[in-house]
């Protein structure tokens, strides 16, 4: 199929393939693979500790997420490029899965965006991710997804109360990613004048495209700046083709890695937590090239990081 359908048109194909072993990755991606790339599901699924919702962690455990990301980056590098994601139509919203509810906001959302878009690979954004769409609060009768309904009953049969089962189902339901896009303040978030197939998230008057387009400090406009940074002439090649190397692997709630290409090097350091952190800088860096706060603070050789601060340094 690849040779007859895709190659004549130089088509980019993306496969849904999970837990592909390192030794057979070249069969799936790259010049000789079935597809151009496959989605990087493993880091997003690090919270799944069993077969049922009630076995899953919530929110996503930081160490498991970081470990899976670093592992994926290591094994994929020789085979080709993976399609990096934070969320998709079969998962809860990344803004809720990766970020504790009390920490939801611009800095946590922008840190999550930087961690993903600066990795090696092909970044995919899912509709609504760019404005920070999150999970909604559900009543049992509102669920549309059969998996969610089944998981609710599995939790009840295991002895959980209605409230507990509903909470678990609400966290993990795929319906969270399938609510209508939030365009503006109008009825049904501007998606349709007719009743949509499922309820709109109640936060649509706060989280919507129209408001965020007008606000420079919105997560939507941050995504635009971050994408422009990745595509810029100065950094496009290193962020596309550069080697990926994990850093600060033992530092809890510090997500860091370097990208190297020729004589150019970038280092991303992120404090993915609600507490301030002090991080030792392992090298002298020439400049800060991207950050989600207005400024960074360095005292001696230590970076004093604010909650959810994420910074990209350059070293030549």
Residue ranges and their predicted role:
Residues 1-286, 291-316:
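Active-site and adjacent substrate-binding regions of carbohydrate-active enzymes
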